[in-house]
Amino acid sequence: MNSLVATPVPPHFYEYSRLSSPHPMSTPTHTPINRKRKADDDGNDHDGRMSASPTNSPAFTPRSLPAPRSFKRSRPNVSGRPLSLPRLLETLDTDALRGILRSMCERHPALADEVIHTSPRPSVSSALQVLRNYQSTLQNSFPLGGNPESDYAYNRVRQPLGNLLDALSDFTPHFLPPHETQASVSLSYLDGATDIIHALPRWHSPQNNIERDSAYDEICKAWILVIREAAKRGGGIQLQYGGWDQKLAKHNQNAGGRLQAAVNELGNSLGWMHGPDSQGYGSSTGGDLVSVREQLLSGTYGLGTPVKVGPW
């Protein structure tokens, strides 16, 4: 009977510990410190980080990538070559450009017409500046010391003097009617051009002053032409306002009376505008007549004229 009864087997050590202790088993104390990590551990950690909730993770700010810099590719073969046309024009000054353009127009007449129609219209200030440049060249050509009115000085400055007079004779017709339709533009140019003629040198020899006297004669004719045309346009308002009577009288005084014909023409035009009752040009009395324009603006034009009443 005893042989038939199974001998009880004692419990296993780990099972006893699990059944006897209510707390989980603590980690073993003898853990190797320098245990190497396996590839599976790295993969598990990476998967854990990727599957973790991003709520506690810091926000990533988008970074703009720097723009790719463009570099010119270096030429494999370095050799000399001429400049392009834009770079070549940058190296030329104004005088060189004028010379090139002038020579091209002389060789190709059709190109000259295109340049004339394409170029902007010269202004009074630009034309007078060119004349002043010639005048400055003339003044710098005088010899140092000696008499500036002698024949020797005249021979030294004859060429720049001729250049100034030629430029003056070329620019003046450009600002005269009918080519120039604005009387104010013509008067402004003549005012500046006459000042340049006043600055021309005077010489001891009368024959050397012929060119200066001729310049006064030409500018006087130009004044007369502009005054007549201005008197026909708008009732001569440009002549009445602007003090042209005083300016022309001063020019005539500086010219030694060589512009008297232009002064007389302006006086006749203003006298005709003021009416037959005016007591001459330039009179300054308390009974001076009000101009036609002022009468029109104030509404008093024609109030003193008798009006016939009754049958005509």
UniProtKB/Swiss-Prot annotation:
Residues annotated as signal peptide: none
Q: Which UniProt keywords apply?
A: Cytoplasm, Nucleus, Protein transport, Transport
Ranges where the record places region Disordered: 15-83
GO CC terms in record: cytoplasm; nucleus
Give GO BP annotations, semicolon-separated: nuclear protein quality control by the ubiquitin-proteasome system; proteasome localization; protein transport
Gene3D superfamilies, alphabetized: Tethering factor for nuclear proteasome Cut8/Sts1
Pfam families, per the entry: Cut8
Keyword field contains Protein transport = yes
Q: Low complexity bias located where?
A: 20-32
User: What coarse category fits the chief subcellular location reported for this protein?
Assistant: cytoplasm
Q: List the molecular function annotations (GO) for this entry.
A: proteasome binding
Keyword Transport, does the record have it?
Answer: yes
Name the InterPro entries for this protein: Cut8/Sts1_fam, Cut8/Sts1_sf
The protein's job, in short, is: Involved in ubiquitin-mediated protein degradation. Regulatory factor in the ubiquitin/proteasome pathway that controls the turnover of proteasome substrates. Targets proteasomes to the nucleus and facilitates the degradation of nuclear proteins.
Q: Which family does it belong to?
A: Belongs to the cut8/STS1 family.
The annotated subunit structure for this chain is: Binds the proteasome.
Write down what this protein is called: Tethering factor for nuclear proteasome sts1
Q: What species is given as this protein's source?
A: Aspergillus fumigatus (strain ATCC MYA-4609 / CBS 101355 / FGSC A1100 / Af293)
